[in-house]
From Swiss-Prot:
This is Ephrin type-A receptor 8. ATP binds at I640, G641, S642, G643, E644, S645, G646, E647, V648, K666. The lineage of its organism: Eukaryota, Metazoa, Chordata, Craniata, Vertebrata. Residues 563-1004 are cytoplasmic. Heterotetramer upon binding of the ligand. The heterotetramer is composed of an ephrin dimer and a receptor dimer. Oligomerization is probably required to induce biological responses. May also form heterodimers with other ephrin receptors. Interacts with FYN; possible downstream effector of EPHA8 in regulation of cell adhesion. Interacts with PIK3CG; regulates integrin-mediated cell adhesion to substrate. Interacts with TIAM1; regulates clathrin-mediated endocytosis of EPHA8. Interacts with ANKS1A and ANKS1B; EPHA8 kinase activity-independent but stimulated by EPHA8 ubiquitination.
Length: 1004
């Protein structure tokens, strides 16, 4: 017999707890599979063994029936009492939740059950595809969890009828079979199951971004997301496939894609509604319906376009948003001016343009031999200048008319919708009568004789003299100089001799006839070259030749004497081994080319100018050295730079049969001057002569369009100085030397061609995606536009002082050696990661310091070999500077011998007075301390903001500062790389100053 069970009265168990256990309807997104609170009477669950769980039916204080399952076998050990639910279909759910409401007795409140009473129970489940009835076994169930009560009641609670209800929820899954059972296992607790609700979660149906999403059951586990594809609502279409994800909590997450209302519909309250009358929408999208344009209407709802009103039309290329227009009225104020057998017609635009601006004009010519009521077409012999139809201007010349004939001219105004109108076109009409005709053109003209100073011509009478020819007029001029001057000669016969011409000169001759009706047209041009002059030397000529020779000998003798006496340089004259390129009239001199066959190691005695300024028209130079590109092949995408006279854009060049090529487009701004256009085309002509991997490549030019454009290859990383500043400290020394080697190779190529750049700086070097550096900017304009401080203005023009050799500043004379000086400054810029040369010194301070012998110190971490090469480039005597071929060979050697780059340069002397604020004379104090403080030193190098950092780090004297290294500076919290370099560079300078204890200070 089973041991006696400690059982509580059902009334004491459930009466008070009943109110708390009443049914709560499923929350939003929850679907109940089982809810015992809605079951009246016995739940019909299976219990095992028989003396375990008891089914209790009671009523609460309101006399409502209450059903529970209770167990309280706390006196006996090893309890194993099972309570199983009926079979529950899962209804497609992959994960369900069990909400259990129960009460549990505190074991401490029951005497004598210390070893047998428990305060927990187990929850199990079993899946099956059908109802198994009572044939389930314990071993078939899978445990879900062990459940303990948050609150348990005691005997005192029973006395006051206050029981403590517990609610626990457990997830069950993943489920795959058609249904399942839940089972409660009692192991010795005193508890009562008041209700059980089994449910699953789902995401509710909704409309989002005009896409309808149906209900979706959540996933099999708590972290899964179920993808659901939406369907566009009525009258909408997909822009991007609409999708959302249903979370395990029954919430919609991560909306992707959307639908948009179709043409003729607009979005209103998650639906697409038809456009009202008088409104339209021409394309699918988010936009709302728009009101019909002027002179149009929509006859039905959901209109995609608006129909034009009567007598109004819309051209084929007009967008649906354009107003409907109509043909223009007739031109007004038509006047004619008859000149013999030609007439000039002029008129004013129509008073009513029809709402359009694309007005052109057509001319209709009718010949009326007898009366204006009997007219016929003028025929193909009539000539219209510039044309008969599609005239843009309001004037026309009609020639080759018959003499003494009546004509009627109709001038029509048409626009883009004139062809759509069935109505006759409006026209202005004028009737005229021609006068006597002028003679026709002289067709045949030939040379009869040509001497040194005269030419005899012979020609035939015009085929249509149209009267008595009174005289002939001969027009002649030197070839290509007609616009400068020409002369005329009259003749009464068909033969004439023109005298007073220059010997050995090519002349152009034209002839025309004149009658009482006027002059005919000039004949076709005929070229004749006069005879070459015979050499004659009279006494006067011989005397002049002798005087010239004697004068030359005297001048040569004086030059030799001056040379022996060591005549010095003057600002007006320079050595004859280099051409002097002076600025004149405030304009920059043209680029200079050396002969192509001169030895690379020497400068020729004479430099030849082979650039666009030698052409009378820069456009001819451009055609000689550049390729014309059709403007339609260029697609501009964005502006990447701007200057005073132009803009630089990024775009793509369409190449037939190939992919589009990314290019940079330099375009002149509207309103440019002729001088700016000439300089612009000259720069293109210069670039077109170069072909080198380290010179920016010219793709072509556009000169025939509205805007002049230069098209070059696109360099992704922009200018070298800005690129280095952006990537401060990110490259190895070998990489930096490789960049310099590319710039040097490009300059060697230019030098070998005899080209002097004159504006070499890091800002004028471009970098592509493979870190290849290419020399650019051959117009000497960028620095002067972008940074006025970078140019020093003299009476002769502007010079980029910080990059220019001293002799070029002093005498305005440029050479390949001055380009070498500039290359040395570029080397310093690269090793200093784009820092400004000479920092904040004024231009005048730079000039004075360089003249005194100061040279830029080595940047932080600069190899000694590279700084020595810089100093060689900055030699005061330009003849001692290396050639670019030597510079490239040195850089090649350094790249192939990285170990030579390990020794870093040191600053051994103090900078000039212009740098006094950043260089202390520490030797005066002996120990290096003197009266100077750390704060004074920081202020002098403009780093006073870090006073507190040094004080907090314990650096109270300059002696302690001198022992700092890069790690110490970073440890103070100074994170900016540029500020670290500036502080460490100043410390290095002070150390070097202390080490130099012998002799006076000298400049580098």
């Amino acid at each position: 017999m089973a041991p006696a069970r400690a059982r509580l009265s059902p009334a004491l168990w459930v009466v008070t707890a009943a109110a708390a256990a009443t049914c709560v309807s499923a929350g939003r997104g929850e679907v109940n599979l089982l809810d015992t609170s809605t079951i009246h009477g016995d739940w019909g669950w299976l219990t095992y063994p028989a003396h375990g769980w008891d089914s209790i039916n009671e009523v609460d204080e309101s006399f409502r029936p209450i059903h529970t399952y209770q167990v309280c076998n706390v006196m006996s050990p090893n309890q194993n009492n099972w309570l199983r639910t009926n079979w529950v279909p899962r209804d497609g759910a992959r994960r369900v939740y069990a909400e259990i409401k129960f009460t549990l007795r505190d074991c401490n409140s029951i005497p004598g059950v210390l070893g047998t009473c428990k305060e927990t129970f187990n929850l199990h489940y079993l899946e099956s595809d059908r109802d198994l009835g009572a044939s389930t076994q314990e071993s078939q169930f899978l445990k879900i969890d062990t459940i303990a009560a948050d609150e348990s009641f005691t005997g005192a609670d029973l006395g006051v009828r206050r029981l403590k209800l517990n609610t626990e929820v457990r997830g069950v899954g993943p489920l795959s079979k058609r249904g399942f059972y839940l089972a409660f296992q009692d192991i010795g607790a005193c508890l009562a199951i008041l209700s059980l609700r089994i449910y699953y979660k789902k995401c509710p149906a909704m409309v989002r971004n005009l896409a309808a999403f149906s209900e979706a059951v959540t996933g099999a586990d708590s972290s899964s997301l179920v993808e659901v594809r939406g369907q566009c609502v009525r009258h909408s279409e997909e822009r991007d496939t609409p999708k959302m994800y249903c979370s395990a909590e029954g919430e919609w997450l991560v909306p992707i894609g959307k639908c948009v209302c179709s043409a003729g519909y607009e979005e209103r309250r998650d639906a697409c509604m038809a456009c009202e009358l008088g409104f339209y929408k021409s394309a699918p999208g988010d936009q709302l319906c728009a009101r019909c344009p002027p002179h149009s209407h929509s006859a039905t709802p959901a209109a995609q376009t608006c129909r034009c009103d009567l007598s109004y039309y819309r051209a084929a290329l007009d967008p649906p948003s354009a107003a409907c227009t109509r043909p223009p009225s007739a031109p007004v104020n038509l006047i004619s001016s008859v000149n013999g057998t030609s007439v000039t017609l002029e008129w004013a635009p129509p008073l009513d343009p029809g709402g359009r601006s694309d007005i052109t004009y057509n001319a209709v010519c009718r010949r009326c031999p007898w009366a204006l009521s009997h007219c016929e077409a003028c025929g193909s012999g009539t000539r219209f200048v510039p044309q008969q139809t599609s005239l843009a201007q309001a004037s026309l010349l009609v020639a080759n008319l018959l003499a003494h004939m009546n004509y009627s001219f109709w001038i029509e105004a048409v626009n883009g919708v004139s062809n759509l109108s069935p109505e006759p076109r409006s026209a202005a009409v004028v009737n005229i009568t021609t006068n006597q005709a002028a003679p026709s053109q002289v067709v045949v003209i030939r040379q009869e004789r040509a001497g040194q100073t005269s030419v005899s011509l012979l020609w035939q009478e015009p085929e249509q003299p149209n009267g008595i020819i009174l005289e002939y007029e001969i027009k002649y001029y030197e070839k290509d100089k007609e616009m400068q001057s020409y002369s005329t000669l009259k003749a009464v016969t068909t033969r004439a001799t023109v005298s007073g011409l220059k010997p050995g000169t090519r002349y152009v001759f034209q002839v025309r006839a004149r009658t009482s009706a006027g002059c005919g047209r000039f004949s076709q041009a005929m070229e004749v070259e006069t005879g070459k002059p015979r050499p004659r030397y009279d006494t006067r000529t011989i005397v002049w030749i002798c005087l010239t020779l004697i004068t030359g000998l005297v001048v040569l003798l004086l030059l030799l004497i001056c040379k022996k006496r060591h005549c010095g340089y003057s600002k007006a004259f320079q050595d004859s081994d280099e051409e002097k390129m002076h600025y004149q009239n405030g304009q920059a001199p043209p680029p200079v080319f050396l002969p192509l066959n001169h030895p690379p190691g020497k400068f020729p005695e004479t430099q030849f100018s082979a650039e666009p300024h030698t052409y009378e028209e820069p456009g001819r130079a451009g055609r000689s050295f550049t390729r014309e590109i059709e403007a339609s092949r260029i697609h501009i995408e964005k502006i990447i730079g701007s200057g005073e006279s132009g803009e630089v854009c990024y775009g793509r060049l369409q190449v037939p049969g190939q992919r589009d090529v990314p290019v940079a487009i330099k375009a002149l701004k509207a309103g440019y001057t002729e001088r700016q256009r000439q300089d612009f085309l000259s720069e293109a002509a210069i670039m077109g002569q170069f072909d080198h991997p380290n010179i920016i490549r010219l793709e072509g030019v556009v000169t025939r369009g509205r805007l002049a454009m230069i098209v070059t290859e696109y360099m992704e990383n922009g200018s070298l100085d800005a690129f280095l500043r952006t990537h401060d400290g990110q490259f190895t020394i070998v990489q930096l030397v490789g960049m310099l080697r590319g710039v040097g190779a490009g300059m060697r190529y230019l030098s070998d061609l005899g080209y002097i750049h004159r504006d070499l700086a890091a800002r004028n070097v471009l970098v592509d995606g493979r870190l290849v550096c290419k020399v650019s900017d051959f117009g000497l304009s960028r620095a002067l536009e972008d940074d006025p401080e970078a140019a020093y203005t003299t009476a002769g023009g502007k010079i980029p002082i910080r990059w220019t050799a001293p002799e070029a500043i002093a005498f305005r004379t440029f050479s390949s050696a001055s380009d070498v000086w500039s290359f040395g400054v570029v080397m310093w810029e690269v090793l200093a990661y784009g820092e400004r040369p000479y920092w904040n010194m004024t231009n005048q301070d730079v000039i004075s310091s360089v003249e005194e012998g100061y040279r830029l110190p080595a940047p932080m971490g600069c190899p000694r070999a590279l700084h020595q090469l810089m100093l060689d480039c900055w030699h005061k005597d330009r003849a001692q500077r290396p050639r670019f071929a030597h510079v490239v060979s040195v850089l090649d050697a350094l790249v192939h011998s990285p170990e030579s780059l390990r020794a870093t340069a040191t600053v051994s002397r103090c900078p000039p007075p212009a740098f006094a604020r950043s260089c202390f004379d520490l030797r005066a104090g002996g120990s290096g301390n003197g009266d100077l403080t750390v704060g004074d030193w920081l202020d002098s190098i403009r780093m006073g903001r870090y006073r507190d950092h040094f004080a907090a780090g314990g650096y109270s004297s300059l002696g302690m500062v001198l022992r700092m290294n890069a790690q110490d500076v970073r440890a103070l919290g100074i994170t900016l790389m540029g500020h670290q370099k500036k502080i460490l560079g100043s410390i290095q300078t002070m150390r070097a100053q202390l080490s130099s204890t012998q002799g006076p200070r000298r400049h580098l």
